[in-house]
Amino acid sequence: MFALREKYKNEIISQLKSELNMSNPMLLPKLEKIVISVGAGDYAKDSKIMQNIADTISLIAGQKAVITLAKKSVAGFKMREGMPMGVKVTLRGKMMYNFLEKLIVIALPRVKDFRGLKRNGFDGRGNYSFGLNEQLMFPEVVYDDIMVTHGMNITIVTSTHSDKEAFKLLELLGMPFAKGR
């Protein structure tokens, strides 16, 4: 499942060189990491559900997920220092390309009424973030094994600081952006 990585090396680099008018291949935008995170919300107090969420994200990512803990106590949110707040996993290298390929080819087409990802998810520094409503679109997730359905946030970090260059890179990689704005 290394087709996306090979496509980047063999095809996309040359396309980016010509479209962005860059002669130095080291200046071309590339993927640095993908961060998948889940905020626990009301489920933070139940350790079994938190572990189930972590196991589900680990299955999806192919890498062990980490339960994130609160750094400070905030009375307004009923949150204490050291309390579990969510789950995250950071993917780099082969695992990153495998996940992105699975997301583009398998998971996103399984979303009901999917019309493409919004283009306004760029942060002004070349990174793209979007959210998914549930985890059932991934083939590794078995409906009977999950305790709660939850969404997830996915952030794709690129080496460029330009949203235009990052958009071009993700578009060439096959990200299904919505038509129009």
Swiss-Prot record:
InterPro entries: Ribosomal_uL5 (IPR002132), Ribosomal_uL5_bac-type (IPR020930), Ribosomal_uL5_C (IPR031309), Ribosomal_uL5_CS (IPR020929), Ribosomal_uL5_dom_sf (IPR022803), Ribosomal_uL5_N (IPR031310)
Subunit structure: Part of the 50S ribosomal subunit; part of the 5S rRNA/L5/L18/L25 subcomplex. Contacts the 5S rRNA and the P site tRNA. Forms a bridge to the 30S subunit in the 70S ribosome.
Species lineage: Bacteria, Pseudomonadati, Campylobacterota, Epsilonproteobacteria, Campylobacterales
Protein's name in the database: Large ribosomal subunit protein uL5
Keywords in alphabetical order: Ribonucleoprotein, Ribosomal protein, RNA-binding, rRNA-binding, tRNA-binding
Any one Gene Ontology cellular component term annotated for this protein: ribonucleoprotein complex
Purpose of the protein: This is one of the proteins that bind and probably mediate the attachment of the 5S RNA into the large ribosomal subunit, where it forms part of the central protuberance. In the 70S ribosome it contacts protein S13 of the 30S subunit (bridge B1b), connecting the 2 subunits; this bridge is implicated in subunit movement. Contacts the P site tRNA; the 5S rRNA and some of its associated proteins might help stabilize positioning of ribosome-bound tRNAs.
Keyword rRNA-binding set for record: yes
Keyword Cell membrane tagged: no
Species annotation: Helicobacter hepaticus (strain ATCC 51449 / 3B1)
Example GO biological process: translation
Entry GO MF terms: rRNA binding; structural constituent of ribosome; tRNA binding
Pfam families (UniProt xref): Ribosomal_L5, Ribosomal_L5_C
Family stated for the protein in its record: Belongs to the universal ribosomal protein uL5 family.
SUPFAM superfamilies to which the protein is assigned, alphabetical: RL5-like
Highest taxon, organism lineage: Bacteria
Recorded coiled-coil stretches: none
